[in-house]
């Protein structure tokens, strides 16, 4: 295994402290990250920087590396190397030096399997009106950069222009292939998953593919019938209130619900009878006339009966 000048790779001095080396690592990892850098050798440089950081960030590995680097030009280096305790070992133990510094993959770096990058999941808020048609959205997220120990060392901001298809539902997951973290040793990148969150609407409630809206009506509109303006996700419509309508009655408006690939839902107008404010003397007299005219009507006739 080639003994590389890790200090030169990191752009630091052998006398620099860990804080200085860590700062250099973060700067270089960001500079050569495959999702940021446009340089053709960015991926190779990124891995080289990560390899250097793996050694120089560990006090024991760094000390062993420094001793090896100091004796790299010694003719006896490949045959006999002096440990700090005066013990020596022969050339057949040479690979063990690298193993102690670089870990198990020192002698088997070429045999390491390709590893797929990590997936990233972010939540995307979508308004009900936006679900009717495909629309473009600019999303921003942080791409984690992992060090040689599998820990997140830093996060790189990333922005993508994406298309949100029509008919998306709450909790639906949209996959953007290869937009996760980079793979290792030639492995594929992870994916970015957009998790759709339908933002609550002030007027509409979602019931499957259908929508519900509460429509306030006056007592006389419910009794005599009326035409009232009701909003939908696209435009306002004129809704017919049949005579004798009751509070809580649901009136169906076909095709005004949510859109999906298979079908379009309906809109249900739920009637809410709203009483006028406390009546004045003249209005009270009119209500009394109505009560007298409907004296045989008992709204509680079947109340409590099975």
Curated annotation (Swiss-Prot):
Pfam families attached to this UniProt entry: DnaJ, DnaJ_C
GO biological process: chaperone cofactor-dependent protein refolding; protein refolding
Domain of life: Bacteria
Any Gene Ontology CC annotation: cytoplasm
Gene Ontology terms, MF aspect: bent DNA binding; unfolded protein binding
Alphabetical list of InterPro entries matching this protein: DNA-bd_curved-DNA, DnaJ_C, DnaJ_domain, DnaJ_domain_CS, HSP40/DnaJ_pept-bd, J_dom_sf
Keywords noted in UniProt: Chaperone, Cytoplasm, DNA-binding
Cellular compartments annotated: Cytoplasm, Nucleoid
PROSITE patterns: DNAJ_1, DNAJ_2
Domain J positions: 5-69
Gene3D superfamilies: DnaJ domain (1.10.287.110), Single helix bin (1.20.5.460), Urease metallochaperone UreE, N-terminal domain (2.60.260.20)
Function summary: DNA-binding protein that preferentially recognizes a curved DNA sequence. It is probably a functional analog of DnaJ; displays overlapping activities with DnaJ, but functions under different conditions, probably acting as a molecular chaperone in an adaptive response to environmental stresses other than heat shock. Lacks autonomous chaperone activity; binds native substrates and targets them for recognition by DnaK. Its activity is inhibited by the binding of CbpM.
Protein name in the entry: Curved DNA-binding protein
Gene name of this polypeptide: cbpA
């Amino acid at each position: 295994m080639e003994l590389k000048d890790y200090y030169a790779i990191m752009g630091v001095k052998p006398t620099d402290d860990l804080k200085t080396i860590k700062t250099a690592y973060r700067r270089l990892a960001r500079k050569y990250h495959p999702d940021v850098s446009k340089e053709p050798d960015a991926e190779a440089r990124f891995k080289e920087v990560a390899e250097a950081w793996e050694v120089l960030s560990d006090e024991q590995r760094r000390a062993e590396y420094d001793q090896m680097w100091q004796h790299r030009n010694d003719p006896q280096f490949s045959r006999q190397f002096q440990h700090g305790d005066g013990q020596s070992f022969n050339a057949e133990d040479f690979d063990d030096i690298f193993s102690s510094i670089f870990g198990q993959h020192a002698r088997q770096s070429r045999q390491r399997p390709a590893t797929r990058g990590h997936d990233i999941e972010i939540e995307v808020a979508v308004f009900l009106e936006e679900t009717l048609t495909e629309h473009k959205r600019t999303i921003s997220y942080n791409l984690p950069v992992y060090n040689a120990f599998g820990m997140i060392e830093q996060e790189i901001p990333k922005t993508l222009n994406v298309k949100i298809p029509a008919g998306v539902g709450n909790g639906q997951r949209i996959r953007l292939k290869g937009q996760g973290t980079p793979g290792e040793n030639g492995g594929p990148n992870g994916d970015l998953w957009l998790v759709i969150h339908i933002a609550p609407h002030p007027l509409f409630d979602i019931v499957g593919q259908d929508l519900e809206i509460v429509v306030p009506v006056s007592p006389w509109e419910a009794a005599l019938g009326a035409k009232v303006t009701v909003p939908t996700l696209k435009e306002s419509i004129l809704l017919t209130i049949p005579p004798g309508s009751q509070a809580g009655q649901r009136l169906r408006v076909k095709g005004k619900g949510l859109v999906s690939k298979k079908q379009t839902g309906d809109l249900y107008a739920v009637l809410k009878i709203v009483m006028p404010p406390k009546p004045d003397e003249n209005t009270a007299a009119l209500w009394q006339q109505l009560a007298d005219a409907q004296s045989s009507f008992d709204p509680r006739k079947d109340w409590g009966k099975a």
